[in-house]
Every structure is written in C-alpha cells, then in structure tokens.
C-alpha cells in the first residue's frame, strides 16, 4: 500500500503539459507515415517571477530575477515559472530541463533596448562573445515549454536596419528621430549611434553580427510553444534547430511587414514536429523549413516528419517555404488545410548551388490563398540572401556542389483567388523534377504558368482563370 501511495504522489507531482487539444486528430488519414511528437513532462512545482525579485513595472531589468527563478526550479527538478500581468524588461533568458515559462494574460516580456543586455559575456574574461545571443534559448535540454496568453516583445526596431524604399516618409522621420546612421546614398537607416542607447561594436557592419533571434532551441527534445504572442523580433521569431518532438500550437507571430529577416517559424534540421493553429503576420518567411548549407547541413541532417495544419499566414515572403539552405534534406512533410492571405508567394521552394539538398515525400493539400502579390506556387534554384548591404555573387552557379534537388513533391487542391502568376519554376536540368500539381483552381492577374523546359512538373486538372480581356 505504501508503494502505491508513493507512486500516486509521484504521478501527481509530474504531469505532462495539457495542450487542451487532441493532437491525435492531426495524425489520421495521412499520405505519409508521421510519428506524433511527445509532449514535454513538467513537474508540478510553481514559482512566480515576483517571488524571485521580479517587477513588472516596465522599468526594472529582470534578467537576474528570471535566472534566479529558473535556477530555483531546476534545483527542484523543474516546474512552472509563472509571469503574472505586467511589463517585464529583461536581457537574456536561458531555460533548463523540465521548465515551463508561463505568461499569464497581460504579461509582457520586453527585451531591453540596451544591446549590451543581450550579448553574452565570458564569465572569466568579461569579453563579449563575437556572435548574436538568442534572447530566449535552450541547448541540449529536454522537456521545455513556453505557454500562456502573454506576449514576448523583441524590440526589433532597436536592432534592424531599414530600407528607405520600404517605409513611408513619416516612418523614415520617426527612425531618424531615434538617432542612428543613414547610408551615404540615403537608402538605408542603421540603428547605430542612437540617441539613447550605446553601440556594441565599432562599426555598423560589426554591430549587425549581434542582431539576435527571439527564441532558439538547439539539440533539445520535447518542446511545446503554445498560446503566446511573439512580437517584433530583431531576426527570426522561433527557430528550433536539430531538435526532436516539437509542437508549436496556437501562437501569434507579428512584426512589421518590412522587418529584415523577420521570419516567423523556422524549423531547422528537426524531427517529429507539429505546427498547428498559428496566426502569422511576418516581415519575411511565414512557416519555413531549413536544413543547413553545405557540409554543416549534411551533418545536421534533414527536416523529417513535419506536420503543418490549420495555420493562417497574412503578410510573409512565403506562406510555406522550403529553403533556401537545406543541404541536409527534407523528408516526410505534410502541409494541409492552411490559409495564406496577402503573402508575397504562397508555396515557395527556393535554393541555390552550395545550399541545396534533396526533398522526399512532400505532400501539400487543401491550401487556400487570396491576394498573393507574387506567385501562388514558385520554384527557384538561383536564390541568394539579399540582406541589407549584400552584393549578389557573380559566380553563384558555377560549382555544382550541394545542388538543389526539388523532387517527390505532390501538391493538390490549392485554391487561389488573386495572384500575379500561378505556377512559376526556374531551374537548370535535374534541379526540379517529379513534381505533381493537380486538382487546383488558380485565378491569376498576369500569367498562368511560367515553367522552364528543364523543369519537369506535371500539371493535371488545374483550372487557370483571369479577368476577361
């Protein structure tokens, strides 16, 4: 009897995060076998950030309070770090095993405008690490979650360069009122030499290297991000990398439409991932699959067993994207019942020599699009990352290493009301082949199809229509 009581107490003390959702329903009637991800298991210990010296007054820096609360929970084997309503200014947050960062309604975590608060410093020498430090991070951890109804604000405008062509006169004036530096041509504003915040490097180019992602999990297992709003990250909003068992459910991601590298959800070389019920309005790609470039991508491995359903993407460079770097490959991906409204492209497959890999078992079905400003479905194999100040390489396609191999992709039941072009594919021989697109309705404004002869795409029962001429 004593053993039974102890077992029951242990069961009550350690509980799996309840997602208030039957995730099993997303794993029925699949065209490819996908394992269902394992939810994180979090001990039922509770700590409030307020009990660790935290203040939600919008003035106090809470970096030490978050570190203290996480350390306290970690010593107990994990638990829930509760953040009540308030505005919590902070620097870097590092999560540990078996911890749930829970934001209650009207709780706002805001990352500091002072870039020094978001740069890792060597504890021995006091020197800055010469790389960007992700605002919320976990490395080689298991059973991690970020949940609740609150907001995480990346304060991205203090980090990102802005192109003059992408802002109004009023917005351009507002940026200049922050101080900063304007390029000699007057076409770029940099958050360098700001009025109220110090530089963290001697040049604009060096400071750009410190621009960070909002949330990054690396080599972790059993991750849940649910319910929260991710706002205005300096770079990508969330990027799990080489992780297994990842669920991203019901989050809102929002940043300015012109936010450089403002990707919403990027999955990099991960296995067993479920992405459902999210709403995205991003500055760059919406839901993007990555797999590393070159040898490092091959070593990291493919994105594998990815299930993407019931999401809505508003502005983004692409609603669903593969690339540009995926040398590790893409395998067993389902994209079903998603809506894209106002994205630059709907389904976007982009890569280039030295960045490409092989796709296998990619199934895309029942996608609904309206007001697509560019192509509804697009394949490109000469993509280059046009970041601020970049110059396109002259010999980008000369050496045939890590060549894109877009193949075994099956697209069906895509319904488009309004796009510039329907289906576009540009690539050299062997880069785009064994693609099927069938049973679709595409209402376009300029061109139904623009497919190179080298691209082997089978288009079946696709109804193209446009305005009467």
Question: What name fits each language-model region?
Answer:
Residues 93-102, 241, 328, 356-357:
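Short, surface-exposed basic-aromatic patches at helix termini and helix-loop junctions that form
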Residues 105-106, 142-150, 221-231, 244-256, ...:
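Right-handed parallel beta-helix
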Residues 326, 337, 346-469:
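Extracellular beta-rich repeat passengers
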């Amino acid at each position: 009897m004593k053993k039974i009581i102890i077992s029951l107490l242990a069961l009550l003390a350690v509980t799996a995060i309840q997602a208030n959702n039957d995730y099993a329903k997303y794993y029925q009637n699949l065209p490819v076998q996908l394992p269902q991800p394992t939810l994180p298991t979090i001990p039922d210990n509770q700590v409030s950030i307020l009990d660790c010296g935290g203040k939600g007054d919008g003035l106090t820096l809470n970096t030490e309070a978050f570190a203290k609360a996480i350390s306290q929970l970690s010593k107990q084997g994990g638990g829930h770090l509760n953040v009540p309503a308030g505005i919590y200014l902070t620097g870097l947050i590092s999560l540990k095993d078996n911890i749930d960062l829970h934001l209650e309604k009207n709780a706002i975590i805001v990352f500091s405008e002072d870039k020094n608060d978001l740069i890792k410093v060597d504890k021995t020498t006091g020197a800055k690490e010469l790389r960007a430090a992700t605002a919320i991070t976990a490395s080689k951890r298991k059973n991690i979650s970020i949940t609740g109804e609150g907001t995480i604000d990346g304060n991205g405008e203090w980090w990102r360069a802005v192109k003059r062509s992408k802002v109004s006169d009023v917005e351009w004036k507002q940026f200049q009122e922050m101080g900063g530096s304007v390029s000699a041509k007057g076409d770029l504003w940099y958050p360098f030499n700001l009025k109220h915040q110090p530089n963290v490097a001697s040049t604009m180019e060096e400071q750009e290297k410190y621009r960070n992602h909002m949330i990054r999990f690396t080599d972790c297992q059993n991750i849940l991000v649910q319910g929260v709003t991710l706002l205005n990250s300096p770079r990508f909003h969330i990027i799990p990398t080489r992780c297994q068992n990842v669920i991203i459910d019901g989050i809102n991601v929002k940043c300015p439409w012109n936010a450089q590298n403002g990707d919403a959800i990027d999955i990099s070389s991960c296995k067993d991932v479920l992405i459902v019920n999210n709403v995205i309005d991003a500055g760059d790609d919406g839901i993007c699959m990555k797999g590393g470039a070159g040898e490092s991508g091959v070593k990291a491995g493919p994105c594998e067993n990815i299930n993407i359903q019931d999401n809505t993407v508003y502005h983004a460079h692409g609603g669903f994207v593969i690339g540009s770097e995926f040398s590790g490959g893409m395998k067993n991906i389902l994209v079903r019942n998603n809506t894209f409204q106002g994205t630059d492209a709907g389904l976007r497959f982009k890569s280039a020599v030295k960045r490409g890999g092989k796709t296998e078992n990619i199934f895309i079905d029942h996608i609904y699009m309206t007001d697509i400003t560019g192509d509804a479905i697009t394949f490109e194999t000469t993509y280059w990352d046009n970041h601020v100040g970049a110059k396109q390489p002259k010999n980008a396609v000369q050496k045939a290493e890590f060549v894109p191999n877009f193949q075994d992709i099956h697209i069906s039941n895509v319904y488009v009301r309004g796009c510039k072009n329907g289906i576009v594919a540009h690539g050299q021989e062997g880069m785009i082949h064994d693609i099927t697109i069938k049973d679709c309705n595409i209402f376009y404004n300029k061109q139904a199809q623009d497919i190179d002869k080298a691209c082997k795409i089978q288009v079946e029962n696709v109804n193209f229509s446009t305005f009467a001429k």
